[in-house]
């Protein structure tokens, strides 16, 4: 998917204007800027939002390309003093701020905090460890989940489908034929969301009424009504999206059709608990092993919930009990839920707390990049029919590379063509924690290193002939904003400090 192309909203009629994801982001940000300037700044240019230090939150699972695009949208909206923060970290910062100094009584050295953030469209997981370093308690983000497009919207769609089938069955019993149009289905999905929140909330409601407008001209008489029960919602949402599984469960994948509609890479398996099990197993060695036997999964001792979906006590209890079952399999105690979080406002409040922590007013979570990043180097071999040239993954940024640091990539000479666009293949790994900058990886296990969007380079000739191959080395750095920057440095520069920024392409692989 080209995230600069006009693909939103997906599935919209032809007469609806479409915009790109990047444009959608900066339009939202522009609206927030205008609202701030109207309500807070009130015409004072010094108080304008574009004059402030802004912390913008993103999913922890955002790769380098997605972070680059987010930054681009923010700059387009006029936000220049910008820092990116992962949303699960923001939720934890909010919890720290709410607890004050008392947080040290609930999280101590050796604790492992699993942040489970399930919102409307995504499920985002992070693991933060409390580590004793020289007598000082340090917080480190040690693991991040995949980018999972799975959340409350999926649950609303399922519940709306169930309710639609009930309406059709009830109409047939009354001798009528019912077929909902596109707009009625959208309305039904909104109504289903309200019923879901009511029946999964703290209340004791046993059922909820759902009503949408009919197609007729009668406003009241044309209304379609039915009822959904607490048991139906629990079966659909709790058991469907949060099933009780063992720690060996993994998200199911299916073979994709030869022809697939272009769009977002939605999760194929709706079971959030399976995605959680996969995360904890994949990062089992993220921390030093306690004892002789290596653990089968990363063992959280604390759980922090965030996101609108997790406001439901039924869902929180299901996730916590499932994790406790996995820990019991490992022979360790269950995890304790950290209470006191505001699941609606935690990310915003945590972003503000992080901004203060950057100024020395609070503890900071260490972590750096959530992945190691690599460029693909194609081997120079004779062409053979049916045989692809071997690819070596050259590490350009190690796992955990901190903000404000940089490194020269020692991987031999790389030749790039000047005066025309060229591409580097780009890879990432959330599990290879020990690869240093310049490491050349010739073989790797399935799912250990994944291919990301390619790196797209357009180097101006700068006094060279168009099409020349210029020997370069790469220099990587993590900016203070929180994005990965790659630069190509010519071995024989035409001018002092000559270097080119290597842009991260926005074209993902389907």
Segments (PLM) and residue ranges:
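Hydrophobic, small-residue-rich alpha-helical packing segments that form membrane-like cores
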Residues: 37-44, 53, 60-62, 70-122, ...
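Short beta-alpha connecting loops at secondary-structure transitions
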Residues: 139-150, 172-180, 260, 329-339
């Amino acid at each position: 998917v080209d995230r600069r192309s006009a693909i939103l909203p997906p599935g919209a009629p032809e007469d609806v204007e479409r915009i790109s994801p990047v444009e959608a982001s900066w339009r939202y940000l522009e609206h927030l800027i205008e609202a701030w300037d109207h309500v807070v700044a009130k015409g004072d240019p010094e108080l304008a939002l574009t004059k402030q230090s802004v912390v913008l939150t993103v999913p922890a699972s955002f790769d380098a390309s997605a972070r680059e695009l987010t930054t681009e949208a923010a700059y387009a909206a006029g936000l220049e003093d910008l820092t990116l923060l992962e949303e699960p970290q923001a939720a934890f910062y909010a919890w720290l701020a709410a607890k004050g100094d008392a947080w040290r009584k609930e999280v101590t050295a050796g604790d492992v905090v699993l942040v489970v953030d399930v919102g409307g469209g995504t499920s985002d997981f992070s693991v933060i460890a409390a580590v004793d370093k020289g007598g000082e308690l340090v917080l480190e983000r040690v693991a991040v989940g995949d980018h999972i497009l799975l959340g409350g919207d999926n649950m609303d769609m399922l519940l709306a489908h169930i309710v639609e089938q009930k309406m059709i069955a009830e109409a047939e019993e009354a001798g009528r034929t019912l077929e909902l149009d596109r707009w009625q289905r959208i309305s039904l999905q909104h109504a289903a969301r309200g019923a879901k929140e009511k029946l999964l909330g703290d209340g004791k409601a046993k059922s909820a009424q759902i009503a949408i407008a009919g197609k007729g001209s009668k406003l009241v008489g044309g209304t379609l009504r039915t009822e959904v029960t607490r048991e139906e919602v629990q079966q659909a949402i709790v058991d469907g999206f949060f099933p009780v599984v063992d720690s060996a469960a993994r998200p199911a994948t299916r073979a994709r059709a030869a022809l697939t509609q272009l769009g977002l890479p939605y999760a194929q398996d709706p079971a959030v608990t399976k995605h959680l099990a996969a995360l904890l197993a994949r990062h089992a060695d993220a921390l030093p092993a306690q004892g002789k036997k290596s653990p089968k999964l990363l063992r959280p001792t604390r759980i922090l919930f965030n996101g609108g979906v997790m406001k439901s006590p039924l869902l929180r209890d299901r996730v916590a009990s499932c994790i406790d079952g996995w820990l019991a399999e490992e022979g360790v105690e269950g995890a304790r839920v950290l209470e006191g979080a505001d699941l609606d406002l935690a990310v915003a409040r945590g972003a503000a707390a992080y901004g203060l922590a950057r100024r020395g007013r609070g503890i900071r979570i260490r972590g750096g990049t959530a992945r190691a990043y690599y460029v693909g180097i194609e081997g120079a071999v004779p062409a053979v029919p049916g045989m692809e040239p071997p690819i070596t993954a050259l590490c350009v940024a190690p796992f955990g590379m901190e903000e404000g640091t940089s490194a020269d990539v020692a991987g031999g000479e790389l030749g790039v063509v000047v005066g025309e666009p060229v591409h580097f293949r780009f890879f990432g790994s959330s599990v290879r924690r020990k690869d240093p900058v310049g490491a050349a990886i010739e073989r790797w296990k399935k799912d250990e290193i994944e291919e990301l969007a390619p790196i797209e380079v357009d180097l101006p000739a700068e006094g060279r002939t168009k099409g020349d191959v210029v020997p370069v080395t790469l220099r990587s750095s993590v900016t203070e904003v929180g994005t990965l920057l790659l630069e190509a440095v010519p071995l024989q520069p035409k001018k002092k400090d000559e270097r080119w920024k290597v842009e991260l392409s926005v074209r993902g692989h389907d």
